[in-house]
């Protein structure tokens, strides 16, 4: 049988206190657990429901009773804590807040019926909102200053490795967080009473109380702590110790932030820590005896790695590391260059540079995580010390060595790695144009002499250069490779002609190449007087070729020809690989027995210097005369045997006592040491060729720029700067750009502006 509805507030209060509220208050005040009956809660809830159903006046009386009960207890709590010492304040505050929450939880459950209709209809605060407001006004607002100070003390202890107070910190900051809830709701979860944001209300990110704590208290405390720590550590630790200490502290700080700091403040806390622990002391770390330059010079990679891990947290400080990194690379590179024994030999010089490049690449990858800033500084450092012509020339020489015999016996993977290393250094060259010119020349020589180990490797290298610098850069190289393929088809067709590719029974092989692509020494194009059986071979091929390619002209590079010549007068009838001038010289010696070098040149119709070069191979080629003994050459004569010098008036003759162990040997001329005058002449010629190419590139670039700016104002200074930016094959100097601007004006491609003589216009 149900109880009658209570209609009087005084009676209702008395019954509510009897059923549950008196017991709750006794518990939160004295810790005496209430001995209510199992039905006490339902009885109390039913009383509230019955009274509220009577109408608004009764509901309002119940609402006021709810608020007054909670407020009264909170005010009593304030009296208990108001004069509490700082040592006991936090513990007392936490305990009282737990009691308040306990009371609010059960009171809100008893009176929850009011939230269904009354508080909504009257636009009043919910029971939980009203209780939280009372907590703020009558307790927290009055003691928040002291609470903020005390919680900061606890955090300072935590930062000083005393983690015992961490749980208290979490509780206090959770209380502050709860106070800021825009729609607070108290619940019981896993036997623990806690506040949450009401899921039925939009969550406004309000942090009023948290902001007061952070902005007015904690931020300045963090500032002071970080500053003091940085100052103490920098004066009492070595650079590596300092780095490790800060990394450890920041790791611990992140744990603290994750455990009890609102994520909203994380960036501000980090900014303070990074500024003092990293930014303020970065330069000092570099200056220390054990600092960043020392780490580089002594290859302390693990220390550099940790330094980067710290400094990357404050990116503007990375410059301190890169400012030490760039000079370090430059110093290492210049040490290699200054070692004359190494730098003169491309087979030693370039591998040393490759090893340095690999080492720096690995350093950037392993210690600096391939950070773009370090990649950029590394590349600039290499470009900075590789700004001399020797680097372009020696890299080209090394590539030539690899293609001729350096790759012999190497695996495909080893060859690929070496090619990539060469390209890696190529990227750093200031004068890529010089490398291009030298490489074209050397590739031409390899392919003509058929001394390249692999055309596939040649093609692979061309492909890598093309990928790096574009198709224009490798035009000549590609054309040379195309010529080889076309020539193979041409020779196959010639072998099917009437002479079968062997006129008069002489096996005859020809390379047809385009003059525009190949680097051919003009001396090799000199006409040479030949016996009829040889001219018949040339005439036979010309007849075949010009029948297919009418209108074209063949220029014979006889100076590049090689022959297999058998020495019938020798006991073993040995065979020698000779040049055409060498063979023709031997024919003259067979005819005249003894003849001057000048006379041979006259008969052959070529320069004396050409004959001397070839005679040198007939006497001193190490394939048959390793000790360079003049009496053991294919020919002998009156030349200077000590200096190994030949003159126009020196007489030569066949050495009939010549012997050689090999059945087939080589008499091809070796590079003869040039005089200083010849060296200077060659250098001047190369410089002129290089400048001519540079001027062509500059004029093409300037024309392209001006053509794209028709109708726009182009100043002299802007044009020079823009041209300098766009040219990457060499470092264009302002004076050189200016000279080519004048050349374009002379060619009527551009003109000075009528309105302003310091500006230029394109002549359409």
What does each model-found stretch correspond to?
Residues 1-764:
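Eukaryotic scaffold/interaction segments
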